């Protein structure tokens, strides 16, 4: 860190500005806006300084070190390098903070680029290394930060003391303010400059805050690549006080959770269910009843084979407020990163997503429907039952030469794609690791042309031939 960011209160404090040109005019405008008691030293000044008449002292003379007496800050804004150097050296000897415009080496402080929503201020600086980049960032921030933020900040200051009296806990106050600032109702009142109604709304919210139940937001984390996280999902995980997350949520996405949030792993893995669903349901209710803003973070989309609906049923029965933020499901994300389109005019007019897990009481899906051609079949969590899936599809008419792919860790740096035919599915599944997605259909053949993401290609090996009832050679797993 080359510079320590800090905000200086200059109201009524003495500041010396050396120079009278356009650059000095810009600095004068900024310093006077901050309330500085400004003294300007320059033989000549721009006519535009007239707009500040009566607000500064103009000494019509050349700079000498004597001008520094009693000053708090010094700014040199001339086009004379010798004068600027003299200002810097003289101020430095007296231990004064000095800025030489556009000369970081001769500045003990610098002016950042400012986004002004007074009293809310945002400052951006590159330490003088990349002013164009700073300007672009400032323009972006200006467009992102609504104009009503200043009024909202003023209003918050008026209610702050009452919030401390009503809510003794820091976490309770933080929760109250986060919800208030995220409220569309409050934002609407501020935008209309209806300050009285806005203040009433905040005070009413404080009166209710102590007895408030929290809320749960069901958030889809997408297939793994943090760049595929939706903007709304990012906002929710950065506002959450408690995050209950699944096994499939990538570490890169968990790194985006705010640092003081409580992280609770409720992950499950095939063959090793570490947290029962009932316990997850209990935790959701418990944390929400304690008044927390809870995010239930699930890989992919929360309503796609993720028990999202079941969890919301529990919350609804318990009277817990909830909302849902959809995510990109693995079937869409992983196939795209593998270069496999789910539908294609020549190869697939439909796509079907199923889970490889057994249904209740061993009920089987409609294999006849799943085995039709010109259809892409995507199977979640299907590795452990791959041999059964293979046999059922072939026995119901799906060709054993149908192209298939198994995508491991789709959309992440660990992505690997194993390809082959339906006859080889069971053996390829033995070579794959979870989490994996099975894709069956003619569209897989397009991967040779369309693969673009830097995954490793899988190789077929240790394959043993068998024969099914239709005479199709199936490569089955040798368990001997």
From Swiss-Prot:
Catalytic residues (UniProt): 246 (proton acceptor), 268 (proton donor)
Residues given in the record as S-adenosyl-L-methionine binding sites: 223, 299-301, 329-330, 381, 410
Gene Ontology MF terms in the entry: NAD binding; precorrin-2 dehydrogenase activity; sirohydrochlorin ferrochelatase activity; uroporphyrin-III C-methyltransferase activity
Residues the record lists as Phosphoserine modifications: 126
Residue ranges, annotated region (Precorrin-2 dehydrogenase /sirohydrochlorin ferrochelatase): 1-202
Family: In the N-terminal section; belongs to the precorrin-2 dehydrogenase / sirohydrochlorin ferrochelatase family. In the C-terminal section; belongs to the precorrin methyltransferase family.
Function: Then it catalyzes the NAD-dependent ring dehydrogenation of precorrin-2 to yield sirohydrochlorin. Finally, it catalyzes the ferrochelation of sirohydrochlorin to yield siroheme.
Name the record gives this protein: Siroheme synthase 2
Organism classification: Bacteria, Pseudomonadati, Pseudomonadota, Gammaproteobacteria, Aeromonadales
């Amino acid at each position: 860190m080359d510079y320590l960011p800090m905000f200086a209160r200059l109201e009524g404090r003495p500041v010396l500005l050396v120079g009278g040109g356009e650059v000095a005019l810009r600095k004068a405008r900024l310093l006077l806006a901050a309330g500085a008691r400004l003294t300007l030293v320059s033989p000549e000044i721009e006519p535009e300084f007239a707009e500040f008449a009566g607000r500064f002292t103009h000494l019509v003379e050349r700079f000498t070190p004597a001008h520094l007496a009693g000053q708090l800050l010094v700014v040199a804004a001339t086009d004379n390098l010798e004068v600027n150097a003299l200002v810097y050296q003289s101020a430095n000897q007296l231990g004064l903070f000095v800025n030489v415009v556009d000369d970081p080496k001769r500045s003990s402080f610098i002016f950042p680029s400012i986004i002004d929503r007074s009293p809310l201020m945002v400052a951006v600086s590159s330490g003088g290394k990349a002013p164009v980049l700073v300007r672009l960032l400032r323009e972006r921030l200006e467009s992102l930060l609504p104009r009503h933020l200043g009024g909202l900040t003023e209003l918050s200051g008026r209610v702050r003391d009452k919030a401390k009296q009503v809510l003794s806990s820091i976490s309770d106050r933080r929760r109250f303010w986060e919800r208030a600032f995220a409220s569309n109702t409050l934002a609407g009142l501020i935008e209309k400059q209806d300050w009285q109604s806005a203040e009433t709304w905040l005070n009413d919210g404080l009166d209710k805050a102590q007895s408030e139940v929290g809320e749960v937001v069901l958030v889809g984390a997408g297939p793994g690549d943090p760049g595929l996280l939706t903007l709304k999902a990012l906002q929710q995980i950065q506002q959450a006080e408690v995050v209950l997350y699944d096994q499939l949520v990538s570490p890169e996405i968990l790194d985006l959770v705010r640092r003081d949030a409580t992280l609770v792993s409720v992950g499950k893995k095939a063959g090793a269910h570490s947290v029962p669903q009932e316990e997850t349901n209990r935790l959701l209710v418990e944390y929400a009843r304690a008044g927390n803003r809870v995010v239930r973070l699930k890989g992919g989309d929360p309503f796609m084979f993720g028990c999202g609906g079941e969890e919301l049923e529990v919350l609804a029965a318990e009277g817990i407020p909830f909302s849902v933020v959809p995510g990109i499901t693995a079937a869409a994300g992983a196939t795209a990163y593998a270069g496999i389109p789910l539908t294609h005019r020549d190869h697939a007019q439909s796509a079907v997503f199923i889970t490889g897990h057994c249904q209740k009481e061993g009920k089987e899906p409609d294999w006849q429907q799943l085995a039709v051609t010109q259809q892409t079949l995507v199977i979640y969590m299907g590795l452990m039952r791959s041999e059964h899936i293979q046999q059922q599809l072939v026995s119901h008419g799906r060709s054993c030469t149908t192209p298939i792919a198994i995508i491991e860790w789709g959309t992440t740096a660990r992505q690997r794609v194993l390809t082959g035919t339906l006859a080889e599915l069971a053996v390829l599944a033995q070579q794959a690791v979870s989490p994996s997605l099975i894709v069956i259909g003619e569209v897989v053949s397009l991967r040779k042309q369309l693969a673009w993401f830097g995954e490793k290609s899988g190789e077929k090996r240790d394959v043993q031939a068998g024969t099914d009832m239709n005479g199709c050679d199936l490569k089955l797993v040798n368990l001997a």
